[in-house]
């Protein structure tokens, strides 16, 4: 992968009118919650939706563009991410506003917990589950994030997005094509904001529901570790953690990566993990679960980027 400076020079003049920040060769370990992985060739932090649209129109389609939010659900490989990584920041995409008696509009970089807090302030029930999800709205929309039996799709009215050419699209709930931890909306779309619908509720009842979510999370999840959240989706009819535990993988280590002793569907960086450590651990767990029960676990964490040149990659990687 060539340097970010080289890429910017090739596009000299095309990006001069942007108001956001362009930073070449930025370590993704500073962005992701795992604190591991190689660099983004160029990191772009747009000022707002208009600035992002201008950027998309200016960058040739053959140049890769990858969008990330607050980095909670990402595993970046050690060879880095070619092209541009777009990170939506709180300044331009992190606001949440009450737009009617029962509706909230949130930017794609708004932390899930901030949406829960705004709903509490507005007296709207149905958003308490976000209080326990370590992520942002963009990721929640893309993967239909959920917890405690509630999912994002239950609250979405419409989603605003930009396509690769910088054109605006407004998607209805049906357009998002939601399923368990999945949206079938085009992967080329960049979500910029969402309109939610809640139901009026009592402040104390909403607050109690949020407190219960927080207590549960702190009791059973390694919230103070470097982790990306749930590693694998729950298979039909069972829980990922149960299958991982039955396969003897609780506490399993590869290098500086470990399956949490506290919650074995959470992978943690104990301090020295590389992207390869983390991915190899995850694939080792998948292989052992398949061998033990015949169940194929599917990654919930998004893996991206290149393997480091010359890096020894285990033969089973990606087979399951």
UniProtKB/Swiss-Prot annotation:
One Pfam family assigned to this protein is: MurB_C
Q: Which GO annotations describe the biological process of this protein?
A: cell division; cell wall organization; peptidoglycan biosynthetic process; regulation of cell shape
Q: Indicate yes or no for the key word S-adenosyl-L-methionine.
A: no
Task: List the GO molecular function terms.
Answer: FAD binding; UDP-N-acetylmuramate dehydrogenase activity
Q: Per the record, what is one GO cellular component?
A: cytosol
Essential cofactor(s): FAD
Asked if the Swiss-Prot or TrEMBL record annotates the protein with the keyword Lipid metabolism, the reply is: no
List where in the cell it is found: Cytoplasm
Give the pathway: Cell wall biogenesis; peptidoglycan biosynthesis
EC numbers: 1.3.1.98
- Keywords from the named record: Cell cycle, Cell division, Cell shape, Cell wall biogenesis/degradation, Cytoplasm, FAD, Flavoprotein, NADP, Oxidoreductase, Peptidoglycan synthesis
> According to its UniProt record, which residues of this chain constitute the active site?
181, 230 (proton donor), 300
Where the record annotates domain FAD-binding PCMH-type, the positions are 35-216
Catalysed reactions, semicolon-separated: UDP-N-acetyl-alpha-D-muramate + NADP(+) = UDP-N-acetyl-3-O-(1-carboxyvinyl)-alpha-D-glucosamine + NADPH + H(+)
The record's listing under HAMAP family reads: MurB
Which NCBIfam families does the UniProt entry name for this protein? murB, PRK13905.1
Family note: Belongs to the MurB family.
Matching PANTHER family: UDP-N-ACETYLENOLPYRUVOYLGLUCOSAMINE REDUCTASE
Query: What role does it play?
Result: Cell wall formation.
Per its record, how is this protein called by name? Answer: UDP-N-acetylenolpyruvoylglucosamine reductase
Please name the source species.
Brucella anthropi (strain ATCC 49188 / DSM 6882 / CCUG 24695 / JCM 21032 / LMG 3331 / NBRC 15819 / NCTC 12168 / Alc 37) (Ochrobactrum anthropi)
